């Protein structure tokens, strides 16, 4: 099940915890809606769209299939490490696993600003990787098990 960011924003105005009300929601497509995750993750009545999406990403699906958040980032904001650092901090302090893929689209002239990384968490037996795709304009932030079925995960990334 998927949801566009525009529909999500409208639904969130009616039911603030809409993402928790949809336990099988796997994809949010916000490529053209201009928002990214915000921390702290929260889905209460005063939470922003970005906080609610962060809360949704960090709530695992019951079948261990990764959630997918597709977004684009506005390069005029300037401080891009501040967008990625909360993911690293949450990963470093995690005690339970969660699977997700964040597909981030950039303007071509700004894609150089990001440095790929790969981290592991021995307690959760997970890895967090930020890497460029075949396109110079798209990066993936992937949180997944260290030992995983590569074919299954590659299918999810498409």
Question: Can you annotate each of these PLM segments?
Answer:
Residues 1-158:
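The conserved beta-strand core of Leucine-Rich Repeat
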């Amino acid at each position: 099940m998927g949801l566009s960011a525009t529909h999500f924003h409208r639904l969130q105005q009616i039911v603030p915890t809409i993402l928790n009300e949809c336990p099988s929601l796997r994809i949010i497509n916000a490529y053209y809606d201009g928002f990214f995750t915000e921390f702290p993750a929260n889905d209460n009545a005063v939470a922003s769209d970005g906080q609610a999406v962060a809360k949704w990403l960090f709530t695992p699906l019951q079948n261990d299939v990764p959630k997918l958040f597709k977004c684009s980032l506005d390069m005029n904001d300037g401080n891009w490490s501040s967008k990625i650092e909360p993911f690293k901090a949450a990963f470093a302090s995690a005690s339970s696993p969660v699977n997700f893929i964040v597909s981030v689209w950039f303007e071509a002239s700004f894609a150089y600003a990001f440095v790929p990384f790969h981290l592991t968490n021995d307690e959760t037996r997970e890895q967090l990787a930020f890497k460029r795709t075949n396109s110079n304009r798209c990066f993936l932030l992937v949180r997944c098990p260290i030992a995983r079925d590569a074919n299954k995960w590659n299918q999810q990334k498409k």
